[in-house]
Amino acid sequence: LIEQGGYPPLAFGFSQGYFYIKANSDRKWLTDKTDRCNVNPDKAEIMKPVTSTYKASTIAYKMPFDSFPKDCWITFRVDIDWTLYGKEKETILKPGLLDVIMSYQQAGKEVKKHIVNKEEILIGRNDEEGYYFKFGIYRVGNSTIPVLYNLAGYEEHEKSSGK
């Protein structure tokens, strides 16, 4: 038996004419590819999860690609409380929380948008080892649209108990 087949617990992406933020949850203790759940950014309502037997996939935010700021640095401040799972019982003990602020310069002025406002959400895996950060470009289907992005200034911090 091999554990495999999960989608990332948190993904920022571009697809079907949208920029989106997606949260995925898997409460199964040992998961495989037989139970797949992946919400479609084009068809999904914001904060309405698509679910399967053990998994949930939720679009926390989306905006049309035409409205997304371009040719500038964009800073995302992301605060996450991961969902707490019941290990072998495959239950959800406490839902997670997601908060995202997007900021950038436009016409010489600072723009700051609170795009996901402390939303209760299912996010994470039933895995006591925790999570790690990874980024990359994943092409969907036969897309040949040129993409360029940079990552700089990435930081992780423990949330203070006063938040």
How would you describe each model-predicted region?
Residues 119-163:
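Ligand-recognition surfaces built from glycine- and aromatic
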